[in-house]
A protein has these predicted regions:
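Membrane-proximal basic amphipathic "stem/tether" segments
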Residues: 1-54
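S-adenosylmethionine/decaboxylated-SAM
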Residues: 49-57, 67-234
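N-terminal pre-P-loop "Q-motif" helix
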Residues: 62
Length: 234
């Protein structure tokens, strides 16, 4: 509960639009204390998963939230993921959406918050965890920056998951580039909306996400705000 009020304070401090704040408040109770539900989903999805630290399963905290919000969505076939780490999110999306395929973009070199992380091992774990999907052409790995990927990309996607470089400038670029290749009716899933790593709160992902929502509100048919933000394009 304390974290909830801290998040509210920070959102107000950075000038978050009231309709976004009210959306976050509305989603508080449905997503409060759902760790047991997420844990059950985690146990069902991940088998023989290799990780550099089994206590750092950030994506797994959102498993129930994502499962509930995409429960009735069936038309997701082409998925793009910006930031893949060890493969948890990619595996979830492939298992949640039948007959889908995913493009995974990551440098596997980390960013500001990853000073002490062994990314050679992280990448090795990703390759192990996703080997079945790679060998069956369900997952394509792109070891490059998201900027380089978008320069070469000529595909459009039904769902795009953004969890790459968390600096505000790069988040802004990733949002614009992702929106341009997202199909009408497609979904943009934005991770770490409540990530407050930088002391200047406006340098964290929430600020560019807020600005993006305001600028594109007329082309957004559905908005769900929690620790992850889900946007459906009109």
């Amino acid at each position: 509960m304390t974290k909830f009020f801290k998040n509210l304070y920070r959102l107000i401090l950075i000038g978050t639009p009231l309709f976004v704040i009210s959306n976050y408040i509305r989603n508080f109770l449905p997503n409060y204390k759902t760790k047991k539900k997420s844990k059950k989903i985690e146990n069902d999805i991940y088998e023989n998963f290799k990780s550099i630290n089994y206590n750092e399963k950030w994506f797994c905290n959102n498993l129930n939230y994502l499962t509930v919000n995409f429960k009735t969505v069936k038309n997701v076939k082409k998925i793009l993921e910006i930031g893949s780490y060890e493969g948890r999110s990619a595996i979830f999306f492939l298992k949640n959406f039948s007959n889908s395929n995913i493009s995974c973009v990551d440098t596997w070199s980390g960013s500001d918050e990853h000073n002490s992380v062994n990314f050679q091992l992280i990448e090795k774990n990703f390759d192990f965890n996703t080997s079945f999907y790679q060998s069956n052409n369900l997952l394509t790995k792109y070891k490059m920056t998201s900027n380089d990927f978008f320069k070469k990309n000529d595909k459009y996607f039904d769902l795009i998951y953004v969890d790459g470089d968390h600096s505000s400038d790069q988040v802004k670029i990733d949002l614009i580039n992702s929106w341009n290749v997202l199909k009408n009716g497609g979904f943009l899933v934005l991770d770490d909306y409540m990530w407050w790593y930088y002391k200047d709160y406006k340098k964290n992902p929430s600020t560019p996400i807020n600005n993006f929502i305001k600028e594109n509100i007329l082309n957004i048919s559905k908005l769900t705000v929690w620790h992850q933000v889900i946007i459906q394009k009109t």
